């Protein structure tokens, strides 16, 4: 009997733990993506190809749909999903006229800091 209990415990410990975005974290991501859609002059570069802000938002929403059960926070979405290609590993680049090109990761972190001001606090 002890062997069976140990086996069951071992199996349970090896099962993957699935993350789940809370409604608040998903609202934060959606607010960030809405903010990104407002950046009409922004060019989003993925694997060397340039995309409009609308195309970037569409692509990031697709990636969110594919990964929402593997992340728990908006920051994880930015760091693990929205900042680089899952296929090539290349970082996404943001181009804005009059500014230096920058990696998408710090740009998206700055954007979410701005858009968080529009999202009600968790539990409200």
UniProtKB/Swiss-Prot annotation:
- Report which superkingdom the organism of origin falls in: Bacteria
The gene behind this protein is yfeK
Key words of the record: Signal
Q: Does the keyword section mention Signal?
A: yes
In the UniProt record, the signal sequence range is 1-19
Look up and give the organism this protein is from: Escherichia coli (strain K12)
Family annotation (InterPro entries): DUF5329
State what protein this is by name.
Uncharacterized protein YfeK
